[in-house]
């Protein structure tokens, strides 16, 4: 009964299956955690969603910014870009079923027994765990409702970038979405910076990676996240696990077996390009 945590797949379905075969993943007894961004860039987004959906209770996933963008394309709000390679998924006979399932997936996973949390981009140091849970539920409730296109149309944007319990309406939902799915850097007070994508050693002062700023969640729980491929899984404090290693850019797909903290990797089938590219609101 093992727990396997895997970074952003981005439609690299063949690499995912090869990695799961490598670790001898058994859905009947094991659990698979996925950091989000299941789709886009790689050629297998349709197969990816079909497979993950078929796993039922054997998978625990969180939504990433590319998953939300796919939902916006599906709702007719955003444009389908050829480089995202989403057309086979959008035109599939089971597209409605798959995407309505996808929009009902969470932004946050918490395992109290393991003291383990997963979110696509991480957890802002401005939140305690109760706030993070409440904020995740706010967005999840809208996404799973009939009014989800209205939210998706308003989610794009960088402001507000500072948390306050007084935030309400679409401004509150946009901050929550950015914190869970787009965050990389923060100011020392925890305020989000939505612009810098430099590597941590080249980040302009006073910005710091979100995980370098102490917060109540990171002090009590381990946190697994994806989103930040240029970290290459390195440079995080103890208990913080960066799992996106850029498979869709030609890097690797990385898996962490939680019980013994052993890593496994599957090389990408694509040519190396570790740049972040033109990610969606990334």
Swiss-Prot record:
Homology family? Belongs to the Ap4A hydrolase family.
Look up the signal peptide feature and give its range: none
Task: Recite the UniProt keywords alphabetically.
Answer: Hydrolase
Q: What is its EC number?
A: 3.6.1.41
Q: Which Pfam families match?
A: Metallophos
For this protein, what reaction is catalysed? P(1),P(4)-bis(5'-adenosyl) tetraphosphate + H2O = 2 ADP + 2 H(+)
Q: Which organism is it from?
A: Salmonella choleraesuis (strain SC-B67)
Keyword Hydrolase recorded: yes
Q: Name one GO molecular function term.
A: bis(5'-nucleosyl)-tetraphosphatase (symmetrical) activity
> What does the UniProt function comment say about this protein?
Hydrolyzes diadenosine 5',5'''-P1,P4-tetraphosphate to yield ADP.
The reply to whether Hydrolase figures as a keyword in the UniProt entry is: yes
* Protein's name according to its UniProt entry: Bis(5'-nucleosyl)-tetraphosphatase, symmetrical
The family database entries (Gene3D superfamilies) matched by this protein are listed as: 3.60.21.10
From the UniProt record, report the name of the gene that encodes this protein. Answer: apaH
């Amino acid at each position: 009964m093992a727990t396997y945590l895997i970074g952003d797949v981005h439609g690299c379905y063949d690499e995912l299956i090869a990695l799961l075969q490598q670790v001898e993943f058994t859905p009947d007894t094991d659990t698979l955690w996925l950091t989000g961004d299941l789709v886009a860039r790689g050629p297998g987004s349709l197969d990816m969603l079909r497979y993950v959906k078929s796993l039922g209770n054997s998978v625990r996933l969180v939504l990433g910014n590319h998953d939300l963008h796919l939902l916006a394309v599906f709702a007719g709000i955003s444009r389908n870009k050829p480089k995202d390679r989403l057309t086979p998924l959008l035109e599939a006979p089971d597209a409605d079923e798959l995407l309505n399932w996808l929009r009902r997936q969470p932004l946050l996973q918490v395992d109290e027994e393991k003291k383990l949390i997963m979110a696509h981009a991480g957890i802002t140091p401005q939140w305690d765990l109760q706030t993070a849970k409440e904020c995740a539920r706010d967005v999840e409730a809208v996404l799973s409702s009939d009014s989800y296109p209205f939210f998706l149309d308003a989610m794009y944007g960088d402001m507000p970038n500072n948390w306050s319990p007084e935030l309400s309406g679409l401004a509150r939902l946009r901050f929550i979405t950015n914190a869970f799915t787009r965050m990389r850097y923060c100011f020392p007070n925890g305020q989000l910076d939505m612009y810098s994508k430099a590597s941590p050693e080249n980040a302009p002062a006073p910005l710091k990676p979100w995980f370098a700023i102490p917060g109540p969640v990171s002090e009590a729980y381990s946190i697994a996240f994806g989103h930040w491929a240029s970290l290459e899984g390195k440079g995080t404090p103890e208990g913080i696990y960066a799992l996106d290693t850029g498979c869709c850019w030609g890097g690797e797909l990385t898996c962490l077996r939680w019980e013994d903290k052993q890593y496994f990797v599957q090389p990408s089938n694509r040519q190396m390009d570790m740049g972040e590219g033109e990610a969606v609101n990334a």
